[in-house]
A protein has these predicted regions:
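Short beta->alpha junction loops
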Residues: 1-5
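Flexible loop/turn connectors
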Residues: 6, 10-118
């Protein structure tokens, strides 16, 4: 199953909740696309009824309707750190886990807005 289908299914499950959230932060932009599809099928408008935020800023995120708010992580840094950590583990230079913080940037577009409290 592709990520968009997971987003579609996740959104529909959330919609069935008695107290559906007003915002969803999904694991990646492809899942966000699935959430967009589900929202459309259910009849909810983004961002008027629900805010959606993605992760990884795929090139098409800014062309979605409305443009997707997303978090961009420098993937080259992530890959570089992953290779370095793998080399350390393979060479038995590191036994303990290491916490890595990567630079990220929030790209605020039109898929989020402050919603009034639901009654």
């Amino acid at each position: 199953m592709c990520y968009a289908k997971y987003g579609d299914r996740l959104f529909k499950e959330l919609h069935e909740l008695e107290d559906m959230p007003t915002a969803i932060f999904v694991a990646n932009d492809s899942m966000a696309a699935g959430c967009y599809k589900a929202a459309y099928e259910i009849g909810l408008k983004i961002p008027e009824d629900i805010s959606i935020i993605g992760f990884n800023d795929i090139p098409t995120a800014k062309y979605m309707i409305p443009p997707l708010t997303t978090v961009k992580v420098q993937m080259e840094y992530m890959g570089e750190y992953a290779v370095h950590m793998l080399e350390e583990r393979l060479n038995e230079e590191r036994e303990l886990c290491m916490k890595v913080t990567l630079p990220a940037r929030l790209h605020i577009r039109d898929s989020v807005k402050e919603l009034k409290q639901r009654t």
